[in-house]
Amino acid sequence: QICYDLRFPVWARNQWKDGEAAYDLLFYVASWPAARVFAWDALLPARAIENLSYAIGVNRVGIDGNQIAYTGHSAAYDFKGERLVDLGEKDQIQVVTLSRSSLEEYRSKFPAWKDADPFTLDS
């Protein structure tokens, strides 16, 4: 998903069929300014928790041509909302290994998806 999409949980909602999730990883590429980094830091782990999936967010670092500051905070979270990687304000690359078996084990022990109400969005 892209940038501002992080604010809309329904767009990221994992869909389940016969106990299988549509995805195991949410990935956000973003340009969130420093003024809103608190929301970025709160919403990214929330999406991981509510969708029983990993969530990775890559956010911009630096100052743009309009003098707007971007502080990064690129991070990876597991399905429990625990931070696996936090790059803070650094402009760098880091590798993270995600465990599918840990994810599947957690989903089987905590099958919250079974309680989700199916719904559709009308245009």
Q: Where in the sequence are the language-model features?
A:
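CN hydrolase (nitrilase-like) catalytic-core segments centered on the catalytic cysteine
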Residues: 6-93
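Residue-level signal for alpha-helical context at structural boundaries
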Residues: 44, 98-99, 114, 121
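Cysteine/selenocysteine-centered motifs that mediate thiol-based redox chemistry or coordinate metal-sulfur cofactors
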Residues: 17, 36, 104-123
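A short, polar/proline- and glycine-enriched secondary-structure boundary/capping micro-motif
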Residues: 9-11, 96-97, 116-117
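A short, polar/charged loop-to-alpha-helix boundary motif
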Residues: 92-109
